[in-house]
């Protein structure tokens, strides 16, 4: 009987498993990777992408392509609930995924408080691809007028972004 392995997220902790996904498939495992993006971005290079040192293709891993090339299934979605008794994951799309074995590597996210004003000009550092969007807005808007940019947060990411 085929068992179902689900990798929740395609981040660093799953890189070795993703590189050897075909081994699981050849052992008759059905392998599904669930993630919010077809790519996984290396967060350590995010500030360099913001500063135009790197382009997105230089700091990302093609998760979907890697999974599908090895016989796995990639689902672009987000897990919103886990039922460990039923071994079932609920996805943001409304779909449900049953599993025999699941591993979580979903990374971090930034939850913004309610903020009034121009939401289109507020960028979080996660997901990392938002830094590219910020870079494009800054590049476009800075040709029109001098910009005032605020970095909120004093941790390592805030220091790197403001530097």
Q: Model segments located where?
A:
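Glycine-/small-residue-rich active-site loops that bind phosphorylated ligands and cofactors
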Residues: 13, 81, 157
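Short, electropositive alpha-helical surface patch
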Residues: 91, 156-163
């Amino acid at each position: 009987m085929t068992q179902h392995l689900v990798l929740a997220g395609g981040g660093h902790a799953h890189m070795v498993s993703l590189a050897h996904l075909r081994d699981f498939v050849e052992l008759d495992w059905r392998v599904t990777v669930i993630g919010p993006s077809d790519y996984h971005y290396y967060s350590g290079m995010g500030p360099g992408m913001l500063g135009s040192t790197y382009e997105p293709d230089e700091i990302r891993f093609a998760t979907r392509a890697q999974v599908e090339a090895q016989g796995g299934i990639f689902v672009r979605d987000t897990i919103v609930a886990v039922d460990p008794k039923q071994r079932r994951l609920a996805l943001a799309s409304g779909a449900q995924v049953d599993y025999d074995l699941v591993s979580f590597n979903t990374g971090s996210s930034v939850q913004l408080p309610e903020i009034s004003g121009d939401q289109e000009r507020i960028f979080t550092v996660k997901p990392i691809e938002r830094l590219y969007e910020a870079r494009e807005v800054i590049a476009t808007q800075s040709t029109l007028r001098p910009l005032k940019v605020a970095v909120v947060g004093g941790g390592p990411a805030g220091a790197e972004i403001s530097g």
